[in-house]
């Protein structure tokens, strides 16, 4: 049985946490809660988390489905090098970002989700995982002339090669001249 790649789960959890923090922050700020500034903080922290977590990391085995537009944010995340590649750093960062948002009821759900993502990232880091970007594969252009020796001469459906017969010269001349063709099946006018 295969080994679980925890970073993939942490990535999804953290991205959802960022969106939940943004939503809770909007509710707290727009609703003019008593401590609305924690809501404003949650919006900023949620946007930062979403920008960091949007690019998926490459899996060790199998293929990784790239998110729409991920390649643009991947270049930005790659610029920070070991700060974004190391999952210990991400675990601590997410845990620290989640603490201030925990003081407001509207953002407590995002706080709990982000703390869970932090624990999952810590588990991924202990298991030796790290973030690697999904690099685009170079496209191989197929050699058109290399696979087809000679194009087919008969229209489909074609009989198997051993059953096909070569047309005689008289038939070829009649076909090219546009003259009448002989029907090999006898036609009768009997009506039953």
Curated annotation (Swiss-Prot):
Residues 31-35, 105 are extracellular. Expressed to a relatively high level in kidney, spleen, thymus and lung, and to a lower level in aorta, adrenals, and heart. Expression is not detected in liver or brain. It comes from Rattus norvegicus. The modification Phosphoserine is found at residues 168, 176. Keywords: Cell membrane, Electron transport, Heme, Iron, Isopeptide bond, Membrane, Metal-binding, NADP, Oxidoreductase, Phosphoprotein, Transmembrane, Transmembrane helix, Transport, Ubl conjugation. One of its GO terms (cellular component) is apical plasma membrane. Its main location: membrane. There is a cross-link at residue 149 (Glycyl lysine isopeptide (Lys-Gly) (interchain with G-Cter in ubiquitin)). Phosphorylation at Thr-147 enhances NADPH oxidase activity by promoting NCF1/p47-phox binding. Ubiquitinated at Lys-149 likely by RNF145. This is Cytochrome b-245 light chain.
